[in-house]
Regions:
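Conserved thiamine diphosphate
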Residues: 1-45, 69, 218, 222-235, ...
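Thiamine diphosphate
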Residues: 1-6, 10-34, 116-267, 273-377, 569, ...
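Structural signature of the thiamine diphosphate
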Residues: 12-74, 238-278, 471-493, 908-962
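Conformationally flexible catalytic loops at phosphate/diphosphate-handling active centers
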Residues: 39-134, 495, 960-976
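Glycine-/acidic-rich phosphate or pyrophosphate-binding loops and their flanking alpha/beta elements
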Residues: 119-143, 156, 274-288, 545-547, ...
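Active-site cofactor/cluster-binding pocket
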Residues: 179-180, 184, 192-195, 199-210, ...
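Ferredoxin-type iron-sulfur electron-transfer modules and their immediate structural context
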Residues: 449, 453, 462-619, 627-831, ...
C-alpha cells in the first residue's frame, strides 16, 4: 500500500521489526524537522504493527539532545500567522509551476546525508547500527536479496543458516526508500556480488517490474560487469513468508538463468511464475519455546495471550514475541495466537508451525481444523473439553488420537466452558485457559503467574467493579485447580488407529468443495492459482455461508411446541436467520424425519397447514435473543446445549429444502414476513448483532430484486468476506440480492451509480418495447402493456417481467431478441445503500448528502451503533455527548449529529428512525414506505454492538433497543413527503412519551 505514496514528495523510511520502529521513528521525525521534507515512517501493517515484542525503549531525554532546535524554531516561524501574513496554496499557471517544483530539489538532495547522520547518532545511543541501506551477511557474498519491511528479519535467519552451511549469501535491508540514494545503496553492496534478487510486496499489473526492483535495476543500468538482477513478489495480502520461501529465492539465484518476476508462497500453476517450494526448516534459536492457541473471536483468548506474553516478559529476562491471526468474521470467528519466548532475540516474523504447546479453546475445532499439526514430539496439548475424560476420548477423531500416541503428547483437558458459566463469565473462558497454560508449562513459577494474572485483572477490570474482578480472580484459581485440570491417559494402541471414514457430500457444488471447504479448514494457502480460474475479478458465488455449519454456539434454542403462540418474533429478530417458521401440509409432516412436531397454524389464511419453528443448530451462534423476545406466557424457546440439539440438523435440511417457503400470505406484517425465505443468512456477524436483523428483513421483503452497495465496515465484513457470502438466492426464482463493496468513502456515490446504470438500461427496455409494440403478436402486446402499467411497482414487475420475457421468447421479430438481451433489467430494481454511522455521519457523509439531494429513487440504511464498530469502537459524529468511546475516553464533549433532521430539511427525502426491538411493526412500516417512496429514503436504525459492553450481554440486544426508546435516548419517527402532498403533516412521531426515570438504568448498561 505504501508504494501508492511514492509520487507525493514525502520521504519514506521503512522499519522491519518492532525494535526498528522504536529506533527509526526518531530518525524520521528528526530529519523531517531539519530537512523541511515531510516523512512517511512506515512498517508492515499487522505483521509489525500488531506484533508484541520485548524491546529497548529510547528515552525522550536521549532524543531531545538530537533535535536541531534552530530548524525547529524555523519550522514554527513558518507557520501561518496573522502577525506575519503570507499566502500559500496559490493557483499557479504553466509559466512558473514547473520551475517552482524543480526549485525544491536541493531539499531532497540533502535528505540521505541527514538520515545517515541521525542513524549514526541513534546507533551511538542504542548500540544498534543503522544505515539508509543495511547490509547483513557474508562479506564476500555472491548472491544477495534486497527487500524492506518485516521480511528482512526472516531473511536474516535464513542468511545465518545458509552461511553456516557453506553458502555466501547476504541481504540489503532498505530503510530510506525515498529519496532513493545511489550513494548509500552502492556503499552497502559487497564488491563480490554476482546476482541480486529484489523482493516487492506489491503487484503493479502491466509494469515491466515492481517498484523496488525497477529502482535497483536503474542504479546498475549501464555499469560494466553489473550483477544479474531479478525481481519477485511475496507476501501479498499479508500472506505469511517463511524461511523455506527465502531459501527458494537463494536457490533460484544459483540457476544458470534465474527466473525473473517470480512469486513465492503460492503455487502458480497458470503462468507458472512461482518458485518450487522448499522443505520447511526450523530456524528459531535453540531453546525458544513456541505456543499456539486456537480460539474464538470474543472468547478472550487473544486478550489473555497478550497478557501472558507480557507476564512472561516482565517476570523473566526472556525475549518474547506474540502475534495474532484472525479470520474476517466478527466475534465468533477463528483466532490463532502465536507466542514465542526464549533466551535469544526472536526474529521469526512468521507464524508458528512446530509448536511445543497447543491449546484448543473451542471443542468444535477438533472436527474442523488440524489443531495438532506440527506439535513437537513430547509437547503438550490442552483442550477446553465440554466432556469428561472418557467422553473426550470418544469425541476425538482417530487422526488426533494417532498423533497424540505417536508423538508422546502430554494431553490435558479442562471444562473451561462449564467453569466460566458457573462463575458468571458466560462464554469467556480466557482466564481459565490462561491459568491452565501456566500450570502445565511452568514457564514461570505458577504462583508468580497467578499473582501477575490477578494484577492484570485489576488493571483491566478494576473500573468495572469488585464483582467482575472477583469473578476473574476465581477463574484464575479454577484454571490450575486439581480436579478441573485433568491429564488424560493416551493409550499406546491409538498409534494403530486408521483415519475415520470421511463422508463426502457429492451434492456440494464444485466451488464449495474445491475452494470454500479448503479455506474454511484454514488451508487456503494450499490453493493454487488455477483454483481461481473463472474468478479472476474477485467475484464469488452467492449463498456460500450456508455450507459452513460452524457449530460455534454453546447453547441453542429448543422449540417448545405446546407453548408457542405463532407470533414469529423469534425469527424476526434472529441476527443470523438460524430460526424460521415453516408451514407444512399433512403429507409433508408425515414425510418429515421421525419425531418432528408441529401444531395447526393459526389464522384464516393458514387453515389446513401445520406450523413449526425450526432451528439450524450448526448455523446458530447461541445469542439467545429469540428466547428473550418470546412473548409466550411460558417461553416457547429454551436454550439447550448444542450437542443435545444435533438431531435438529436433519429436520432443518428437510424443512429448508423440501418444505420450503410457501407464499400463502402477503408479507404485510411481522408474523407473515417471516414465512418468506431470508436472502441474507448465516453471516459472520457477532452473536446477538444489532445490525443484521434489519438487513435480513429487507432481504425477505425485497431480496429478489435487490441491488446493494455496501460501505466498508462491519456490514461489508459480515456481508462479503471470502469465502462466506451470506446473500443468497430464492430457491424458486433463482433471484437474489446483487451485492458489491467499493470503498469506505464513496459508497453512496457507488450505489447511486448502480441505480443510474440499471435505470438507464430499464428505460431503454421501455423505449424499445413501446417503439416496436406493433411488430409483436396480440398476446405479447398484452404482456408488454401489463409490464408498462406496473413499471414503477417493484413487486408487480416480478410477475409482469417473467410474463413479458416468456411472450418475447416466442416472437421472431429482431426487436424481441434485442429486448431479451436486456431481460435482466425488466424488473424494477430495489437499490439499497448499506453502511454504518462511521460511513454515513463521518467519512462518507458528503456522498450521502449528495445522493439524498439528487432526488433519485435510492434507499439508504444506516445501521447506527454510534461508534466505529469494525475497528474497535472509536467515537464518530454519531456518538452522543458524554459517551465514553475510543478517542473520547473522558466522554464526548459535543452532541450527536442529527442526521435525520438534516435529511428532512430537504423536504423531499423520506426519513425514518427505527429500533426493531422497541417497535417491530414500526420498522416494517418504515422500510415498506421507504422502498415504495419514489425518491431518496434514509433509514437510521439503532443497533446495539459488542463494543457497547452490555452487562446483560448481546443476548439482550433487542431488549436494549426497547430500553433506549422507552427512556427517551432514541426516538422513533417517520417523515414521509407523500403525506404533505395529501395535505397532512409529513412527520409522524412513533415513540411514546419517554419515561426518564429509566434513563440512568439504560446508561448503566
Amino acid at each position: 500500500d505504501v508504494y501508492a505514496a511514492r509520487q507525493t514528495g514525502f520521504a519514506m523510511l521503512a522499519s522491519g521489526s518492532v525494535q526498528e520502529v522504536m529506533d527509526l521513528s526518531a530518525v524520521s521525525h528528526l530529519t523531517a524537522i531539519k530537512s523541511r521534507v515531510p516523512f512517511v515512517n512506515f512498517f508492515d501493517g499487522f505483521r509489525t504493527s500488531h506484533e508484541i515484542q520485548k524491546i529497548e525503549e529510547l528515552q525522550m531525554e536521549d532524543i531531545k539532545g538530537l533535535v536541531d532546535m534552530d530548524a525547529l524554531q524555523a519550522f514554527r516561524d513558518r507557520a501561518l500567522n496573522s502577525e506575519n501574513p503570507v499566502t500559500r496554496g496559490t493557483a499557479q499557471n504553466p509559466d512558473i509551476y514547473f520551475q517552482g517544483r524543480e526549485a525544491s530539489n536541493k531539499f531532497y538532495d540533502a535528505v540521505p546525508d541527514m538520515v545517515a547522520d541521525y542513524m549514526d547518532k541513534i546507533s551511538a545511543i542504542t548500540g544498534r547500527k543503522y544505515r539508509p541501506f543495511d547490509y547483513y551477511g557474508a562479506a564476500d557474498a555472491e548472491n544477495i536479496i534486497i527487500a524492506m519491511g518485516s521480511v528482512t528479519e526472516t531473511i536474516r535467519e535464513v542468511i545465518d543458516y545458509e552461511n553456516a552451511n557453506g553458502q555466501k549469501v547476504g541481504m540489503i535491508a532498505v530503510h530510506l526508500y525515498r529519496p532513493f540514494s545511489a550513494k548509500y545503496f552502492m556503499e552497502a553492496v559487497p564488491a563480490t556480488v554476482k546476482r541480486i534478487t529484489v523482493l516487492d510486496r506489491t503487484k503493479e499489473p502491466g509494469a515491466n517490474g515492481d517498484p523496488l526492483y525497477l529502482d535497483v535495476r536503474d542504479i546498475f543500468y549501464g555499469q560494466a560487469n553489473a550483477p544479474v538482477i531479478v525481481g519477485g513478489r511475496y507476501g501479498m495480502g499479508s500472506k505469511d513468508v517463511t524461511p523455506s520461501q527465502i531459501i527458494a529465492v537463494y536457490k533460484n539465484m544459483e540457476r544458470n538463468e534465474p527466473k525473473n518476476q517470480f512469486t513465492i508462497g503460492i503455487e502458480d500453476d497458470v503462468p507458472f511464475r512461482s518458485l518450487p517450494a522448499e522443505a520447511d526448516v526450523k530456524m528459531t534459536p535453540a531453546g525458544t519455546y513456541e505456543a499456539k492457541f486456537y480460539g474464538l473471536g470474543s472468547d478472550g483468548t487473544v486478550g489473555a495471550n497478550k497478557n501472558s506474553i507480557k507476564i512472561i516478559g516482565g517476570a523473566t529476562n526472556k525475549y518474547c514475541q506474540a502475534y495474532f491471526a484472525y479470520d474476517s468474521k466478527k466475534s465468533g470467528g477463528f483466532t490463532a495466537s502465536h507466542l514465542r519466548f526464549g533466551d535469544c532475540p526472536i526474529r521469526s516474523t512468521y507464524l508458528i508451525t512446530t509448536p511445543d504447546f497447543v491449546a484448543c479453546h473451542v471443542p468444535a475445532y477438533i472436527h474442523m481444523y488440524d489443531v495438532l499439526k506440527g506439535l513437537q514430539k513430547g509437547g503438550s496439548f490442552l483442550l477446553n473439553s465440554i466432556w469428561d475424560e472418557e467422553e473426550t476420548k470418544k469425541h476425538l477423531p482417530n487422526h488426533m488420537k494417532r498423533y497424540l500416541a505417536e508423538n508422546e503428547i502430554n494431553f490435558y483437558i479442562i471444562n473451561g466452558t462449564k467453569i466460566g458459566q458457573e462463575l458468571g463469565l458466560g462464554n469467556r473462558t480466557n482466564t481459565i485457559m490462561q491459568s491452565a497454560f501456566f500450570k502445565i508449562t511452568n514457564v514461570i513459577p505458577y504462583e508468580v503467574a497467578v499473582s501477575e494474572m490477578k494484577h492484570a485483572i485489576d488493571k483491566s477490570y478494576g473500573k468495572k467493579g469488585e464483582a467482575i474482578v472477583n469473578m476473574n480472580y476465581a477463574a484464575v484459581d479454577a484454571g490450575g485447580k486439581e480436579g478441573n485440570l485433568i491429564k488424560v491417559t493416551v493409550p499406546a494402541e491409538w498409534k494403530n488407529l486408521p483415519d475415520d471414514e470421511i463422508k463426502h457430500d457429492e451434492n456440494r457444488p464444485e466451488f464449495i468443495r474445491n475452494i470454500v471447504d479448503v479455506m474454511n479448514a484454514q488451508k487456503g494457502d494450499d490453493l493454487p492459482v488455477s483454483a481461481f480460474n473463472g474468478y479472476e475479478d474477485g467475484t464469488f458465488p452467492a449463498g456460500t455461508a450456508k455450507f459452513e455449519k460452524r457449530g460455534i454456539a454453546v447453547n441453542v434454542p429448543e422449540w417448545q411446541v405446546e407453548n408457542c403462540i405463532q407470533c414469529n418474533q423469534c425469527a424476526y429478530v434472529c441476527p443470523h436467520a438460524a430460526i424460521r417458521p415453516f408451514l407444512m401440509s399433512d403429507e409433508e409432516l408425515a414425510a418429515a424425519p421421525a419425531g418432528t412436531q408441529a401444531k395447526p397454524a393459526i389464522g384464516k389464511e393458514l387453515a389446513g397447514y401445520k406450523f413449526r419453528i425450526q432451528v439450524s443448530p450448526l448455523d446458530c451462534t447461541g445469542c439467545g435473543n429469540c428466547a428473550d423476545v418470546c412473548p409466550a406466557k411460558t417461553k416457547a424457546l429454551v436454550m439447550r446445549p448444542l450437542e443435545s440439539q444435533m438431531v435438529e440438523e436433519n429436520r432443518w435440511e428437510y424443512m429448508d429444502k423440501k418444505v420450503g417457503y410457501k407464499k400463502v400470505v402477503e408479507p404485510n406484517n411481522v408474523k407473515n414476513s417471516q414465512f418468506t425465505q431470508p436472502l441474507f443468512e448465516f453471516s459472520g456477524a457477532c452473536a446477538g448483532c444489532g445490525e443484521t436483523p434489519y438487513i435480513k428483513l429487507i432481504s425477505q421483503l425485497f431480496g429478489e430484486r435487490m441491488m446493494v452497495a455496501n460501505a466498508t465496515g462491519c456490514s461489508s465484513i459480515y456481508g462479503g468476506s471470502a469465502p462466506s457470502t451470506p446473500y443468497c438466492t430464492n430457491y424458486e426464482s433463482g433471484r437474489g440480492p446483487a451485492w458489491a463493496n467499493s470503498l469506505f468513502e464513496d459508497n453512496a456515490e457507488f450505489g447511486f451509480g448502480m441505480a443510474e446504470g440499471a435505470n438507464r438500461l430499464r428505460e431503454r427496455v421501455k423505449r424499445l418495447a413501446e417503439e416496436n409494440l406493433n411488430s409483436f403478436s396480440a398476446d405479447t402486446q398484452a404482456a408488454i402493456n401489463a409490464w408498462i402499467e406496473a413499471y414503477e411497482d417493484g413487486d408487480k414487475t416480478l410477475a409482469t417481467s417473467d410474463a413479458m420475457a416468456a411472450a418475447l421468447a416466442k416472437e421472431t421479430a429482431p426487436a424481441a431478441k434485442e429486448l431479451l438481451i436486456l431481460k435482466n433489467y425488466f424488473t424494477k430494481k430495489s437499490q439499497w445503500i448499506f453502511g454504518g454511522d462511521g460511513w454515513a455521519y463521518d467519512i462518507g457523509y458528503g456522498g450521502v448528502d449528495h445522493v439524498l439531494a439528487s432526488g433519485k429513487d435510492v434507499n439508504i440504511l444506516v445501521v447506527d451503533t454510534e461508534v466505529y464498530s469494525n475497528t474497535g469502537g472509536q467515537s464518530s459524529k454519531s456518538t452522543p455527548a458524554g459517551a465514553v468511546a475510543k478517542f473520547a475516553a473522558s466522554g464526548k464533549r459535543v452532541r450527536k449529529k442529527d442526521l435525520g433532521m438534516m435529511a428532512m430539511s430537504y423536504g423531499y427525502v423520506y426519513v425514518a428512525q427505527v429500533a426493531m426491538g422497541a417497535n417491530q411493526a414500526q420498522y416494517m412500516k418504515a422500510i415498506k414506505e421507504a422502498e415504495a417512496y419514489p425518491g431518496p429514503s434514509l433509514i437510521i436504525a439503532y443497533a446495539p454492538c459488542i463494543n457497547h459492553g452490555l452487562k446483560a450481554s448481546m443476548g439482550k440486544s433487542q431488549q436494549e433497543e426497547k430500553k433506549a426508546v422507552e427512556c427517551g435516548y432514541w426516538q422513533l419517527y417517520r417523515y414521509n413527503p407523500m403525506l404533505e402532498i395529501e395535505g397532512k403533516n409529513p412527520f409522524q412521531l412513533d415513540s411514546k412519551e419517554p419515561d426518564y426515570t429509566k434513563f440512568r438504568e439504560f446508561l448503566m448498561g
